Amino acid sequence: MKVLAPLVLASAASAHTIFSSLEVNGVNQGLGEGVRVPTYNGPIEDVTSASIACNGSPNTVASTSKVITVQAGTNVTAIWRYMLSTTGDSPADVMDSSHKGPTIAYLKKVDNAATASGVGNGWFKIQQDGMDSSGVWGTERVINGKGRHSIKIPECIAPGQYLLRAEMIALHAASNYPGAQFYMECAQLNVVGGTGAKTPSTVSFPGAYSGSDPGVKISIYWPPVTSYTVPGPSVFTC
């Protein structure tokens, strides 16, 4: 495994991904419609950068005026594709299979989802899928599941506008920091029907992750990984 790792890294060096569209009630809202997509599919590697919130420099991110209405308590699906021009949904159309790591989703309540930068405090985690007991990673489930990343919008949050930050972290080069590859985009939501019964604790981006976190700096090749701690806070529950 130690011998093969450099070959894996070299072959996967340019294999990236983008959260390109959002599906609500079985309807895809359209490429870049209500999702801030970059023109390039490369990762963010600096967890202290403002770009760790909703992507950004060195990537150019397009704005969108659409705010997608979502019913609290329902599931939405982030659709991941290798490039904006990718039309298929085979594993290779999503992300290289070497890109093993967690899938994560956060929400942040904002006054205006179309203009809020996402940088700073207010984020709370609503989904995570790390490595299961059989050694299969969250990214593998998305890659082999046609790029579909299912996320439940909690029923107990207050109604209003939110940013939805969907993320996949690739750990194939994470034995040193920087090395982990963070892929994230933000969707713009108007959440309706929430009860507001609970107020989540929040974290900041940048700030929620550290380069020394065990879920950020880790060798997934050798020694064999037997457990994995997803970075960031615990998942908010109602």
Swiss-Prot record:
Pathway: Glycan metabolism; cellulose degradation. Its main location: secreted. Residues 1-15 form the signal peptide. GO terms for biological process: cellulose catabolic process; polysaccharide catabolic process. Its EC number is 1.14.99.56. The record marks 172 as: Promotes oxygen activation. Inhibited by increasing levels of ascorbic acid. May be utilized as part of enzyme mixtures used in the degradation of lignocellulosic biomass for biofuel production or other industrial purposes as it improves efficiency of conventional cellulose-hydrolyzing enzymes. It is found in: Secreted. InterPro entries: AA9 (IPR049892), AA9_LPMO (IPR005103). GO terms for molecular function: copper ion binding; monooxygenase activity; oxidoreductase activity, acting on paired donors, with incorporation or reduction of molecular oxygen; oxygen binding. Its cofactor is Cu(2+). It holds the Pfam family AA9. Keywords: Carbohydrate metabolism, Cellulose degradation, Copper, Disulfide bond, Glycoprotein, Metal-binding, Monooxygenase, Oxidoreductase, Polysaccharide degradation, Secreted, Signal. Binds 1 Cu(2+) ion per subunit. Cu(2+) binds at residues 16, 99, 183. The keyword Transmembrane does not apply. Belongs to the polysaccharide monooxygenase AA9 family. Monomer. Catalyzes the oxidative cleavage of glycosidic bonds in cellulosic substrates via a copper-dependent mechanism. In the presence of an exogenous reductant ascorbic acid, degrades phosphoric acid swollen cellulose (PASC) to cello-oligosaccharides and 4-ketoaldoses, the end products oxidized at the non-reducing end. Somewhat active toward tamarind xyloglucan and konjac glucomannan, with improved activity with glucomannan in the presence of PASC. H(2)O(2) is able to substitute for O(2) in reactions with PASC, xyloglucan and glucomannan. Very weak activity on cellopentaose. This is Lytic polysaccharide monooxygenase NCU01050.
